[in-house]
Amino acid sequence: MKVAVLGAAGGIGQALALLLKTQLPAGSHLSLYDIAPVTPGVAVDLSHIPTAVEIKGFAGEDPTPALVGADVVLISAGVARKPGMDRSDLFNINAGIVRNLIEKVAATCPTALVGIITNPVNTTVAIAAEVMKKAGVYDKNRLFGITTLDVIRSETFIAELKGLNVADVKVNVIGGHSGVTILPLLSQVEGVTFTDEEVASLTTRIQNAGTEVVEAKAGGGSATLSMGQAACRFGLSLVRGLQGEANIVECAYVDGGSEHAEFFAQPVLLGKNGIEKVLPYGEVSAFEANARDSMLDTLKGDIKLGVDFVK
């Protein structure tokens, strides 16, 4: 099993690489790529950790050597948010980065499962899909926008609010991966009831949690460590699915035939072909139905931005 991390010298990439080095199955290969010259050194640093995961780092303009034979590609390359920016401000820089990297993925490892972390995810996933369509290699079951950070934040904040063991909290988050498009389905959390006020405040906190971190870091970065953990959780789920493990379900932003938008985050069953099945997200409350319906114009606009960028 070979996993490639593109953008591996950045804050998310280094955290993700560290977690993968310690958690990938024995015998796996971990390939790190970044434009930054430090990247081979990051790999050397991580290679001193005593796990049976081979690691190699590549720097420079061309990610191809890192991508050869990759089963899973996780893309975190790009610029991070700073105070006052929202995820769409990142579009102007990150759109081109994702396009260029996906062109190389399409040419080098077209059947790999691709997980996109680079923001704005609502748009960068649409860019990736269009690039792969142009290259004639698009498989909607192999492309994912990683929204796991919204899920782990939801789990954490619910457990804190209700005094629960966080390991027992499971929550689906649907929609997209920015602002109002992030919709935690709090009405479905088992064994927990929320007041209307709690639902409103929790939903808003989850939607704005990225800004909470950006502001707390006072210009020194964005949510890199929690995103690294979220991306590792999702990446390991992709690997477990590829290895034939049953019942691996994660929420992800996918081209899943949603009635709501071309790309939509919802639970998916993972397997040897990536998405084995897009799962229904179930009954929602009136609050959630309203929030879902009112986000769709924003989400569709984000998607169109990506499609138009490639065309």
UniProtKB/Swiss-Prot annotation:
It catalyses: (S)-malate + NAD(+) = oxaloacetate + NADH + H(+). One of its GO terms (molecular function) is L-malate dehydrogenase (NAD+) activity. GO terms for biological process: malate metabolic process; tricarboxylic acid cycle. Keywords: NAD, Oxidoreductase, Tricarboxylic acid cycle. The active site is at residue 177. PROSITE patterns: MDH. It comes from the Bacteria. NAD(+) binds at residues 7-13, 34, 94, 117-119, 227. InterPro entries: L-lactate/malate_DH (IPR001557), Lactate/malate_DH_C (IPR022383), Lactate/malate_DH_N (IPR001236), Lactate_DH/Glyco_Ohase_4_C (IPR015955), Malate_DH_AS (IPR001252), Malate_DH_type1 (IPR010097), Malate_DH_type1_bac (IPR023958), NAD(P)-bd_dom_sf (IPR036291). Gene3D superfamilies: Lactate dehydrogenase/glycoside hydrolase, family 4, C-terminal, NAD(P)-binding Rossmann-like Domain. Its EC number is 1.1.1.37. Substrate binds at residues 81, 87, 119, 153. GO terms for cellular component: cytoplasm. NCBIfam families: MDH_euk_gproteo. Belongs to the LDH/MDH superfamily. MDH type 1 family. Catalyzes the reversible oxidation of malate to oxaloacetate. Homodimer. This is Malate dehydrogenase.
